[in-house]
């Protein structure tokens, strides 16, 4: 326990919290190249084949990123834009690929939440 005089001299240090998206190096997004595109199964109560990709970022870190939406055109060597955001039922997946930017196409026939999936407005 410090004395009052020690606190006057030195003060208290703020604790530094852990960054959840370390590979982005404090950027909102980062560009990367897909090294492997595959499917994986989620944790216990859920059942599906979730689409994910291993991506080597421009920060020289390789991460696993989730491909949101139905259907995708990604393959090895595709250029993608990656943002933070984990997938709760996939352990180790802490990043998501942004649809509709670089080599990633938007989701076809998407009516709601279009901006999240890079889908253009349909002509009526």
Curated annotation (Swiss-Prot):
Lineage of source species: Bacteria, Bacillati, Actinomycetota, Actinomycetes, Mycobacteriales
Keyword annotations of the record: Methylation, Ribonucleoprotein, Ribosomal protein, RNA-binding, rRNA-binding, tRNA-binding
GO cellular component: small ribosomal subunit
Region (Disordered): 105-124
Composition bias, Basic residues: 108-118
Organism: Mycobacterium ulcerans (strain Agy99)
Keyword Ribonucleoprotein: yes
Annotated function: With S4 and S5 plays an important role in translational accuracy. Interacts with and stabilizes bases of the 16S rRNA that are involved in tRNA selection in the A site and with the mRNA backbone. Located at the interface of the 30S and 50S subunits, it traverses the body of the 30S subunit contacting proteins on the other side and probably holding the rRNA structure together. The combined cluster of proteins S8, S12 and S17 appears to hold together the shoulder and platform of the 30S subunit.
A molecular function GO annotation: structural constituent of ribosome
Gene designation: rpsL
Entry similarity comment: Belongs to the universal ribosomal protein uS12 family.
Cited CDD domains: Ribosomal_S12
Protein name: Small ribosomal subunit protein uS12
Lipoprotein keyword on record: no
Subunit structure: Part of the 30S ribosomal subunit. Contacts proteins S8 and S17. May interact with IF1 in the 30S initiation complex.
Any one GO BP annotation for this protein: translation
Modification type 3-methylthioaspartic acid: residues: 89
């Amino acid at each position: 326990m410090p004395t009052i005089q020690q606190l006057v001299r030195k003060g208290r240090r703020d604790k530094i919290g852990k960054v959840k998206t370390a590979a982005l190096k404090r950027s909102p997004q980062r560009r990367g190249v897909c090294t492997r595109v595959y499917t994986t199964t989620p944790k216990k109560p859920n059942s599906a084949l979730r689409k994910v990709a291993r991506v080597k970022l421009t920060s020289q870190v390789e991460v696993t990123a989730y491909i949101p939406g139905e259907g995708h055109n990604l393959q090895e060597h595709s250029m993608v834009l990656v943002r933070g955001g984990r997938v709760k039922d996939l352990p180790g997946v802490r990043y998501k690929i942004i649809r509709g930017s670089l080599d990633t196409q938007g989701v076809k026939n998407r009516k709601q939440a279009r901006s999240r999936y890079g889908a253009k407005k349909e002509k009526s």
